C-alpha cells in the first residue's frame, strides 16, 4: 500500500566527488533530507508512534508530547497529522524560524522554553506535562524505539548500499538514536566497522548536536557501541556545510556539516577507508539563521 509512511527510508547514498582526501579513501554520505519531512528523524518518529500503537499504549486521538530541537518535532508533527494524533512539542526559542513554521504547518502545538533553559529545560517541562496527565511522552532520548528504527532500516541500508565495503561510520550525536541503532546492526555483520561519533567542542553550539551533561545523557546511548568521539568546532561544521553546497551540490544543515567534517578527518587519517556519514537534513531549515548569508560567499568563507 502506498501511503506517506512507506516513503520513509531507503534514502540515497552518494560518494563525495571533490571534497575527499587524495589518499585512496572514499567518503559517502546518506541523504536523509530525502525523507518526506526532510530529515533522518522521520525514521525514529515513525518507529516511536507505530511501536507504541502495537503495544496498545496510544491510539489516534491521543495527545502526544515531545521535547525537540527541531527535526524530531517536524517528523512527529507529520506522523501525528497522518495518523490523527494531537502533537505538543517543546523547543528552545533560539531554534530557527523555519523549524517552528514547519511544526505549526503540520498542526502541532508548539511550546517554547528560553534559550537559557535549552534542551534540558524542554525535556524537564515535557516530563512534567506528562506526569500531570497532559499527554503521552514519547521521550526520544530514552525510548528504545528510536535506535530500533536505525537498527532495522538505516544500518541495513548502509550495509547493502556499500556492498559491505564500509570501514567507518560517522554520525553526529544528539539523541544518539542514529549512531546507537546503526552501530548495533553493523556490530552484527561479518567484518569490523569503526563507529565514530561527533559532538560540539566546548563552547560551540551546533543545532541538533549536543555535548550532554552527565545527568542528561540519553538513556538509549550505549558507549560500548562507539569506538571514538570527535569534537567539532561550530565554524568547521558551518564551513563544511557551505562547501558541501558549493562544491558537491549537497544543500544540508549545520549538524550534517559537522558529520561530514568528521568523516573527512577520518578519511584523511585512514588511507583506503570507505567512510559513511549521515547528512541528516536539508539546508533550507537554516536560511534564516544567516549561515548561508552572502558575506560567507563574497569573502570566500567556506568555499
Where are these regions (language model features)?
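PLP-dependent amino-acid enzyme catalytic core
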Residues: 1-303
Amino acid at each position: 500500500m502506498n501511503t506517506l509512511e512507506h516513503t520513509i527510508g531507503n534514502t540515497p547514498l552518494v560518494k563525495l566527488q571533490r571534497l575527499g582526501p587524495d589518499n585512496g579513501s572514499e567518503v559517502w554520505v546518506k541523504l536523509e533530507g530525502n525523507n518526506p519531512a526532510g530529515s533522518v528523524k522521520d525514521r525514529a518518529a515513525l518507529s516511536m508512534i507505530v511501536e507504541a500503537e502495537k503495544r496498545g499504549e496510544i491510539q489516534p486521538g491521543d495527545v502526544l508530547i515531545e521535547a525537540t530541537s527541531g527535526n524530531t518535532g517536524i517528523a512527529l508533527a507529520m506522523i501525528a497529522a497522518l495518523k490523527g494524533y494531537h502533537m505538543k512539542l517543546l523547543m528552545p526559542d533560539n531554534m530557527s524560524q523555519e523549524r517552528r513554521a514547519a511544526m505549526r504547518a503540520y498542526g502541532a502545538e508548539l511550546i517554547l522554553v528560553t534559550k537559557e533553559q535549552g534542551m534540558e529545560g524542554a525535556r524537564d517541562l515535557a516530563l512534567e506535562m506528562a506526569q500531570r496527565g497532559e499527554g503521552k511522552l514519547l521521550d526520544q532520548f530514552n525510548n528504545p524505539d528510536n535506535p530500533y528504527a536505525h537498527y532495522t532500516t538505516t544500518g541495513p541500508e548502509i550495509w547493502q548500499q556499500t556492498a559491505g565495503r564500509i570501514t567507518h561510520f560517522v554520525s553526529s550525536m544528539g539523541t544518539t538514536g542514529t549512531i546507537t541503532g546503526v552501530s548495533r546492526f553493523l556490530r552484527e555483520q561479518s567484518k569490523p566497522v569503526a563507529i565514530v561519533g561527533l559532538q560540539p567542542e566546548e563552547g560551540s553550539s551546533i543545532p541538533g548536536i549536543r555535548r550532554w551533561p552527565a545527568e542528561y545523557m540519553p538513556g538509549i546511548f550505549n558507549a560500548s557501541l562507539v569506538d571514538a568521539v570527535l569534537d567539532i568546532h561550530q565554524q568547521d561544521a558551518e564551513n563544511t556545510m557551505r562547501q558541501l553546497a558549493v562544491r558537491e551540490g549537497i544543500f544540508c544543515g549545520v549538524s550534517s556539516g559537522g558529520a561530514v567534517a568528521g568523516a573527512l578527518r577520518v578519511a584523511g587519517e585512514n588511507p583506503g577507508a570507505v567512510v559513511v556519514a549521515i547528512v541528516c537534513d536539508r539546508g533550507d531549515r537554516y536560511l534564516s539563521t544567516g549561515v548561508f548569508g552572502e558575506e560567507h560567499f563574497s569573502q570566500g568563507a567556506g568555499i
